[in-house]
A protein has these predicted regions:
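Beta-lactam-recognizing serine transpeptidase/beta-lactamase-like catalytic domain environment
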Residues: 72, 78, 299-316, 325, ...
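Solvent-exposed, polar/charged alpha-helical surfaces in well-ordered, non-transmembrane soluble domains
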Residues: 90-97, 101, 205, 209, ...
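A generic structural motif
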Residues: 84-86, 654-658
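Structural motif corresponding to the C-terminal cap of alpha-helices
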Residues: 336-348, 426, 599
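Amphipathic, well-packed alpha-helical segments that form the structural scaffold of globular domains
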Residues: 286, 290-293, 303-304, 334-342, ...
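Short, highly charged C-terminal tails/helix-capping segments
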Residues: 683-700
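Membrane-proximal periplasmic segments of bacterial cell-envelope enzymes
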Residues: 1-314, 350-359, 699-702, 710, ...
Length: 745
């Protein structure tokens, strides 16, 4: 390189260096400007974010039995949820159509509470509300008011407004109805940047996978785990446990008599789409079971980009409610009651009216704890939603909680109460007698009778209870008057609430103020007829009070409230004395003696049971009659055992059961189950979810269809080899119970 060329290169390099220095200077100046002059402004812009808070629903607490076995629990379900923050500029209705199609592919339902039908062939709509539902009527009224319509607006008017409001004119009529229903649900759930929208609940795993496969075309559509109520033992106390469900319109928006609107559940932290206890223990213990919801915070910057998602408040599960019942013992009592009713029908009720229903309640005498409360027929919590129509149409009323809400004439089971009243008041003593001639002739125009089964002549109170002598209790009841013996019956637990946590029938006693009162009604009431009606749980409470020598405890289902995570006892139900009859000397001992002799008058297992049982049967008349004019009869029973040191008390009713003594074997079966439970040898068939059985049956039927010829051959072979089976029939019932039905006409 010569000198000239070298100078050219140097000049060029110097020029490049100068240009680079100028550029660097400009960058440095710009950086200084940004940092020092506008630094605060840009920093604020960079950190300009918005936090959005979403509720994380807490798991509902469990309901367990006295041993800790779960009855009602929380399981994981999956909801299809729309998050408005993450949807971006996606066309909402197009996305909704896509989601609906995916749900339809998998036979899933989406939330649609709009009370309007699909369009008919002419494009017209009708309301689908129930005329008997005040909730539906209020929902329709609120919807019309919100849309600015008059209350006489038709379903077509409402749909027209919904289509216009949500700009659905371009869609076909069927799609207008679908999308209008979804938009209505969005409004109901207050869908917004801070409120996600639950579009479908408890979807299958197949649907979960389907939605996730289409996640790229469904921004903001999420699969969210949720807690759902499930029943590991759906057959245990379904009517007492109650149900959970959606918050209804009338509970969410409450209008008082002055027209003032309040939202009490919202003020307690509920959302419109939350689940809540709506009946039974689920409702009574809602505050304990509900738990505390958590909070998820999503942070979005000024450009709309989500920069952070975190749980800022961890949800706390609800507390566990522990019951006093042992689920195995409850199931054993359920089975014993069903077997007893079946036996009555097979052996005795061979005519036109079968024993189709009943109840049996077992209490712990020491503290009033409910050990079992059986209803027959009953229902399964796991089938309630799908089988509700069938249950509600069943004439045997499986949804009716007979144990707590059924009211029945007590019949001769009432006689021990009259005996207590007479002894405690001093009207009679252990030596007092009444001459039973078979006919009570005190009144000139009314001569009720007694069968004199096993007795006649002068009898004392112990003998009168043993043989259920009507004449004795007619005379004693007349001399006492209903005012006196009713007061004692009330203190013993009849005709009033027992104190259980859930809804129960009050019942009533026969009063002199009754419109149909006569002197004859007064003595009828003394043998448990008249206007007196009581519930099975009252009978059990009454029996327990007799066993406790006049001390009546509050009857209760709940043993304790537990911390779900640790099992720590947070509170425990203590025995609560509700009333006391002091007793005049040996009042309760004499009644006990009479009741302990009753089993010897009854055929069957109870007469030879190795443990002494104190009991009293009852056979009250029903209003219905045979063609001959003879009244149908219920079978009633109270009992406690062991008679000398009572542990349990029992109250039983069987509708159309005939004589009360027919429930004697049921008392023995309950006693056997109780003692087996105590020593750990009680064995019962485990609960099988009927939904699982249905699925297995469906699969089996598919297999059977392919093997029908072989099955038919096997059936013929089995039939040819089968030998006749002999049914063992219990000994006939020969007890005193005709006395209950022997009221002079």
């Amino acid at each position: 390189m010569n000198e000239n060329e070298r100078k050219v290169v140097v000049r060029r390099m110097l020029l490049l260096i100068a240009v680079a220095c100028i550029i660097m200077g400009l960058y440095t100046f710009r950086l200084i400007f940004l940092q020092l002059v506008n630094g605060d402004s840009f920093k604020a812009k960079a950190t300009n974010t918005t936090d959005y808070k979403f509720t994380v629903t807490a798991a509902r607490g469990n309901i367990v039995d006295s041993t800790g076995k779960r009855i009602a629990t929380t399981s994981t379900g999956y909801n299809v949820v729309l998050n408005k923050l993450q949807m971006g500029n996606q066309d909402l209705d197009t996305m909704l159509q896509q989601i609906v199609e995916l749900l339809r592919q998998n036979d899933e339902k989406w939330l649609d509470t709009l009370l309007i039908s699909e369009p008919d062939a002419a494009g017209n709509y009708t309301f689908t509300d129930s005329a008997d539902s005040t909730s539906d009527q209020k929902t329709l009224a609120d919807m019309k008011e919100t849309l600015g319509l008059q209350q006489y607006a038709t379903a077509n008017d409402v749909m027209e407004m919904l289509v216009e409001k949500n700009q659905l004119e371009s869609f076909s009529l069927p799609w207008q109805r679908v999308l209008a229903g979804i938009h209505y649900e969005m409004d109901r759930q207050a869908f917004s940047n801070v409120n996600n929208f639950i579009m479908a609940e408890n979807v299958s795993q197949v649907t979960v996978a389907t939605i996730k496969e289409h996640s790229l075309t469904l921004p903001g559509v999420e699969i969210v785990e949720t807690s759902t109520r499930s029943y590991e033992q759906g057959d245990i106390l379904p009517a007492v446990l109650g149900r959970v469900g959606k918050i209804t319109a009338e509970k969410w928006k409450v209008t008082d008599e002055n027209g003032q609107v309040t939202y009490p559940l919202k003020e307690k932290g509920y959302n419109m789409n939350d689940m809540i206890g709506i009946s039974g223990l689920e409702s009574v213990y809602e505050d304990e079971l509900r738990g505390k919801d958590g909070v998820e915070t999503i942070t979005r910057n000024s450009d709309g980009v989500i920069v952070d998602t975190k749980i800022t408040t961890v949800p706390e599960p609800g507390h566990t409610v522990q019951l006093t019942i042992n689920s195995d013992f409850q199931r054993a009592v359920d089975k014993a009651l069903a077997n007893n009713i079946d036996m009555i029908n097979r052996v005795y009720n061979t005519g036109d009216m079968k024993a189709a229903a009943g109840a049996a309640v077992v209490l712990d005498v020491k503290d009033g704890s409910v050990l079992a409360a059986a209803n027959y027929p009953s229902f399964d919590q796991n089938l309630y939603a799908t089988n509700y129509s069938e249950y509600s149409a069943d004439p045997s009323l499986p949804l009716f909680n007979r144990a707590l809400q059924g009211l029945y004439t007590p019949g001769s089971t009432f006689k021990p109460a009259v005996a207590v009243a007479a002894l405690d008041s001093g009207l009679i003593n252990q030596y007092s007698t009444v001459n039973c001639t078979g006919v009570y002739t005190y009144y000139k125009d009314y001569h009720p009778r007694c069968t004199r089964h096993g007795h006649s002549g002068n009898i004392d109170v112990v003998t009168a209870i043993k043989w259920s002598c009507n004449i004795f209790f007619y005379d004693v009841g007349r001399r006492l008057t209903s005012d006196v013996y009713d007061a004692y019956a009330y203190k013993l637990g009849l005709g009033q609430r027992t104190g259980v946590e859930v809804n129960e029938a009050v019942g009533r006693l026969t009063k002199k103020t009754d419109k149909n009162y006569t002197s004859s009604l007064d003595i009828q009431a003394a043998i448990g007829q008249g206007n007196t009606v009581v519930s099975p749980i009252q009978l059990a409470t009454y029996a327990a009070t007799l066993a406790n020598n006049g001390v009546r405890y509050r009857t209760h289902f709940v043993k304790a409230i537990l911390d779900t995570n640790t099992g720590e006892v947070l509170s425990e139900t203590q025995p609560e004395v509700m009333d006391i009859i002091e007793g005049n000397g040996n009042t309760f001992e004499l009644v006990r003696q009479g009741m302990t002799l009753v089993p010897s008058t009854i055929s069957g297992k109870i007469s030879s049971y190795p443990i002494a049982i104190a009991c009293k049967t009852g056979t009250p008349q029903r209003s219905e009659t045979y063609a001959s004019g003879k009244h149908y009869l219920n079978a009633m029973m109270i009992a406690y055992l062991p008679a000398d040191d009572p542990e349990i008390a029992i109250g039983i009713t069987v509708e159309y059961g005939g004589y009360g003594a027919r429930t004697g074997d049921l008392v023995v079966d309950i006693a056997n189950a109780y003692f087996a439970m105590k020593d750990g040898t009680l064995e019962v068939d485990p609960y099988v979810d009927p939904r699982t059985v249905a699925q297995e049956d469906a699969a089996a039927s598919d297999t059977a269809a392919q093997t029908a010829p072989d099955a038919a051959n096997d059936a013929q072979t089995a039939a040819a080899a089968a030998e006749p089976q002999q049914t063992t029939v219990p000994a006939g019932v020969t007890e005193e119970e005709n006395n209950d039905a022997m009221l002079a006409q």
